[in-house]
């Protein structure tokens, strides 16, 4: 698994604060690609920009260009900074890529340019949109004596563990699957996205909601124990390179959308409302 590589990136970002004052920008800017699963087709590209002092830049960018390093073809994309929660966030862009290989992300702000390289695979590492993902065997509340044996959430919501994935995709309801580890999340976004899901699910009784813990042996572990943690079988079966991830499946079990990292309550609501139309 690639969790350790991205753990370093997220930990680094989480230490620093966002800055709204970009008037004193120097020549040194660092672009950090946060999203990890890029493939031919539709993608969401998440990235952060840090100044020389490690502060996150949040202002509107003058230009954002993605260049294919194989063909030199360039794509001008739109992006804006998305605030996750107080002091943290990232730039988010939607882009459609027609070739695998290495790409260059080039940004410009206040006449200062910076860039980063990212890889695009022929096929997504995680389940493909428009297809049925592999069947998962997941634990549910009725099979354990204590919910805290299957989730690191300090205040677990029983309704997120009442049904297994196998049963969920058979009951003709849309299904939302969140992979996160609230107590051991290096990005600091697992808890907030889980809380967002708890807050909005009460208005969507016609959906299945599942939370799947990322690690098998999370009990009594801390972030100092990352090297000893073992990911769960569902994480392996769906090929997750990072955490958290959230997946939206229609009432036939077909994947309609997926998101890596944090998404807001409004984004969750938007995706749920789209599923209602299928």
What do these predicted ranges mean?
Residues 2-9:
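Sec-dependent signal peptide recognition
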Residues 14-17:
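C-terminal motif of bacterial Sec signal peptides marking the signal peptidase cleavage site
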Residues 21-98, 106-150:
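Contiguous segments within soluble domain cores/interaction surfaces
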Residues 134, 141-145, 256-278:
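Thiol-/selenol-based redox modules, centered on thioredoxin-like
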Residues 146-151, 157, 165-186:
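Short active-site neighborhood of thiol/selenol oxidoreductases, capturing the structured segment around
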Residues 187-203:
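Typically the conserved alpha-helix immediately C-terminal to a functionally engaged Cys/Sec
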Residues 211-243, 247-255, 271-275:
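Thioredoxin-like thiol-disulfide oxidoreductase module
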């Amino acid at each position: 698994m690639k969790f350790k590589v991205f753990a370093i990136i997220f930990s680094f970002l989480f230490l620093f604060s966002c800055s709204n004052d970009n008037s004193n920008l120097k020549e040194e800017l660092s672009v950090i690609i946060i999203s990890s699963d890029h493939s031919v087709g539709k993608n969401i590209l998440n990235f952060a920009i840090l100044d020389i002092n490690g502060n996150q830049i949040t202002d509107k960018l003058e230009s954002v260009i993605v260049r294919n390093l194989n063909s030199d073809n360039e794509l001008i994309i739109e992006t804006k900074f998305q605030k996750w929660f107080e002091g943290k966030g990232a730039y988010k862009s939607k882009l459609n890529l027609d070739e695998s290989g290495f790409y260059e992300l080039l940004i410009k702000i206040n006449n200062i340019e910076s860039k980063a390289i990212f890889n695009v695979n022929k096929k997504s590492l995680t389940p493909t949109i428009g297809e049925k993902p592999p069947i998962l065997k997941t634990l549910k509340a009725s099979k354990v004596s204590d919910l805290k044996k299957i989730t690191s959430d300090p205040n677990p919501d029983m309704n997120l563990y009442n049904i297994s994935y196998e049963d969920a995709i058979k009951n003709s309801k849309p299904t939302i699957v969140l992979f996160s580890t609230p107590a051991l999340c290096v990005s600091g976004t697992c808890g907030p996205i889980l809380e967002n899901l708890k807050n909005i699910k009460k208005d969507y009784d016609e959906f299945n909601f599942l939370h799947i813990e990322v690690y098998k042996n999370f009990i009594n572990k801390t972030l100092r124990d990352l090297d000893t943690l073992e990911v769960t079988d569902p994480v392996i079966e769906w090929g997750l390179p990072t955490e958290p991830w959230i997946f939206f499946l229609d009432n036939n079990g077909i994947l309609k959308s997926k998101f890596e990292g944090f998404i807001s309550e409004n984004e969750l609501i938007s995706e749920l409302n789209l599923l209602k139309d299928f």
